[in-house]
From Swiss-Prot:
One of its GO terms (cellular component) is respiratory chain complex III. Keywords: Electron transport, Heme, Iron, Membrane, Metal-binding, Mitochondrion, Mitochondrion inner membrane, Respiratory chain, Transmembrane, Transmembrane helix, Transport, Ubiquinone. The gene is MT-CYB. Its cofactor is heme b. A ubiquinone binds at residue 201. The keyword Metal-binding applies. This is Cytochrome b. It comes from Ochotona huangensis.
Amino acid sequence: MTNIRKTHPLMKIVNHSLIDLPAPSNISAWWNFGSLLGLCLGIQIITGLFLAMHYTSDTLTAFSSVTHICRDVNYGWIIRYLHANGASMFFICLFLHVGRGIYYGSYTYSETWNIGILLLFAVMATAFMGYVLPWGQMSFWGATVITNLLSAIPYIGTDLVQWIWGGFSVDKATLTRFFAFHFILPFIIAALVMVHLLFLHETGSNNPTGIISDADKIPFHPYYTIKDALGFLFLLTLLLSLVLFSPDLLGDPDNYTPANPLNTPPHIKPEWYFLFAYAILRSIPNKLGGVLALVLSIAILAVMPLLHTSKQRCMMFRPISQALFWILVADLLTLTWIGGQPVEHPFIIIGQLASFLYFLLILALMPACSLIENKLLKW
C-alpha cells in the first residue's frame, strides 16, 4: 500500500515541501536561517496572541495594560519579553538570511528574491507598529517622527500624515489602528512566506558553490530536518538566555516612561535593527531626500539581480568581491552604531560617508569588481 503522506491531498503538499523535497547535499549552516525565521514567526504569532488577550489599545490604558501583563498575568513577563526579544532574533536571522543571499548569489532566483524583499518591508512595518503599542516615550515620539516623514511627499504629504494619524497628532486613533495592523500583518507575512517557498521550490535551493546540483540531491528528511532542529536549539538557547538574564538589554529605558506629548526625549531613536536605515535617513539634510534614501536602503536589494555582472554566481571563488562584501557588512555595522549616536560632530560626517559608501558599494563597486574578476578568469 502507498504511504498516506504520498497520497493524501494535504499530506502530499507537506511531503513535497518538508520530507521528500530534493535538497543539495552540500548546503551549509547559512541555509538554516530560513527555517529559523519560520520558528521566529511562529514564536511571535503565539506570544503576540497571548499578549493581545490582555492588551488594551487605548492611550489612557495601553501603558498600564503592559505593566499589568508583566506584574499580574501568569507568566506574562516571559511572554512579553519573549515577544520583544523574539523581534530582535527575527531581525538577526533576517539580516543573516539576506546577507547569505547576497554572498552566494541567491538573488538570481528573482521571484523568490522579490517576495523576500516584500517580506522584509512587511516585517519592518510590523516591528515599527509593534514598538508603538506599549505607549512609552520612545513609542510615542518614534511614531510621531517616522510617520511625520511622509509629510515630505510633495502635494499630498500633509493630508497623508493626518490620514494615517486619524487626527492632527499621534493619538488614540493612531494607536488603535496600529494595533489592528500589527495584529493582521503577521498572518499576511505567513501567507507571503508560503509564496516565497512556492517560488523557491520551483527552482530548488542554491548551494555554496553556486553550481546547479540536480545530479546530487538528497531528501530533506532526515538530513536537513535534524540540521534545522540543531539550529532551533541554538536560537532558543540564545533567545531564552536573553529573556531570562537581561531582557531589557536591547530596549530603550525611555520606553519605561509613559508617553508624554509635552516632553520630548533628548535622543529619539528606533530599535537597534532600524538604526542603519535611521542613520541613512539622518545623513541627508533634505527631508524628502532622506525619506527616499531610507526607502532605497532596502529597495536597492531589488536591483541586485540586474547588477550581477559576474560569470560566476556566488562569491565563493571571487576574493575581490568577498572583500567588498565584508566591507559592506562593516559599513552596515558602522551605520547601526551611528544611528544610535546624537546628531553632532564627528558622527554627522561619519554617517554621511558610511551612507555614501553603502550605495556606492552596491551600485558601482561590486558590479565593477565582478567585471574585473571576469577578465582575471581569462588569464
